[in-house]
Structures are given as structure tokens and as C-alpha cells.
Design a protein with these regions (language model features):
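Amphipathic alpha-helical interface elements
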Residues: 2-84, 95-108, 112-123, 159-189
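Acidic/His metal-coordination segments adjacent to aromatic residues that form catalytic metal sites
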Residues: 92
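A mid-sequence interfacial segment
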Residues: 115-162
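Short intrinsically disordered terminal tails
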Residues: 192-195
């Protein structure tokens, strides 16, 4: 699973140290749970990205149907391959290509909120993400985990609403582009072929 890249900042180190210096019992029993507003943001990230995936798949499948891609199992491709094809099949203007690349980068946030447990830091506007997955641990660190090691990430609170706003804009653009491309394809099929 693709996760956001690790970025060492002073703030991130401070937040991670708060976690490391707190007993797991206290983290799991005393740290604040997500608020209703937090949960709504998480749901929006997951839902918006689901619609981004739907539109990316519609594009790639339409290109396969139009013979821009070889016939095959396009419908079975993992999302990362679909994102790659969406970026490379057409000669996109630079700003459109950047939008597609940004969607792929932001999928890592969707993965984070969808696959990690989330808590709030007690005295900071920040989120703690916790997972226990050996495969993801190895992918992130290159090593096997020690007994009871957890994969964690931290995120400042204001970042998540900003991601939602950015994803909403990207989705609106992608939905419009997808509709235009599918309409062009339908219009081209409606033109009678010469005898």
C-alpha cells in the first residue's frame, strides 16, 4: 500500500516523541478519539478518492475500447497502474498532467486514513495514525519489525481539511474531463462510416 513519504520535520519529531514517551496503555485508553468532525473529514477523503478512482478507471477503459491501449485485462489493473496509464496515454497539457500526478500523490492520504487507526494527540491539534502490518512495516523501513512494534504516522490537524478541499477540486476537474472524453467517444461512434 502506498503511504505518504516520511518527512522529518521538527514538529513531526516532537509529535512522534510524544507518542514514544507515552505507554501504549495510555495511548489506547486516554488519548482522545476522533471528533465527529474528524470522522466526517476521514469519510470525505475516502469517498472523494473512491470517485476519483471510478473516473480514472472509466477513462482508461474508454481508451482501451478506443484502441489507444492494447486489449487485455485493463479492468483488473491495480489502481497504481491505472493512475500511471491515465498520466501517459494522452499528451496532457502540463497543468492537467500535474493534476493527475497530484491525485496519485494524495491517494497516500486516503490509504493512511482508511487503513490506520486514528487518534488525536491530547494537547496538540494533530493526528496519530497507528497500524500493525508486517508487510507495510517492511515496505516503509526495509526491516522486519521488533515484537509489538507499530507503524505510526503523525499529521498536523489543519492538513486534513486542506487535503479534502484539494481533492474536491481535483475530483470536479477529473469528472468534467472524463465526461468530455466519454462524450467525444460516443459522438465519434455516432458518426456514420463511409461506404
Amino acid at each position: 500500500m502506498a503511504l505518504p513519504p516520511n518527512s522529518e520535520t521538527e514538529r513531526g519529531l516532537y509529535l512522534r516523541n510524544l507518542f514514544y514517551n507515552t505507554s501504549p496503555v495510555d495511548v489506547f485508553t486516554k488519548w482522545p478519539k476522533l471528533t465527529a468532525e474528524d470522522q466526517a473529514l476521514v469519510g470525505r477523503v475516502i469517498n472523494i478518492y473512491s470517485f476519483i478512482e471510478i473516473n480514472l478507471r472509466r477513462l482508461v477503459e474508454s481508451w482501451e475500447d478506443a484502441a489507444l491501449l492494447p486489449k487485455g485485462r485493463i479492468k483488473d489493473l491495480p489502481l497504481g497502474k491505472v493512475e500511471e496509464l491515465a498520466q501517459t496515454v494522452l499528451p496532457w497539457p502540463e497543468h492537467n498532467l500535474n493534476a493527475l500526478k497530484r491525485m496519485a500523490a494524495l491517494r497516500t492520504f486516503r490509504n493512511l486514513v482508511a487503513h490506520f487507526g486514528m487518534l488525536r494527540f491530547p494537547d496538540d491539534d494533530a493526528f496519530l495514525f497507528i497500524a500493525k502490518s508486517e508487510a507495510d512495516y517492511k515496505k516503509q523501513t526495509g526491516d522486519e519489525s521488533a515484537e509489538d512494534a507499530m507503524l505510526i504516522a503523525v499529521l498536523d490537524g489543519p492538513i486534513l481539511p486542506g487535503v479534502v478541499v484539494e481533492l474536491e477540486g481535483l475530483l470536479m476537474w477529473l469528472a468534467t474531463v472524463t465526461a468530455q472524453i466519454l462524450k467525444q467517444k460516443a459522438d465519434a461512434k455516432a458518426v456514420p462510416k463511409p461506404n
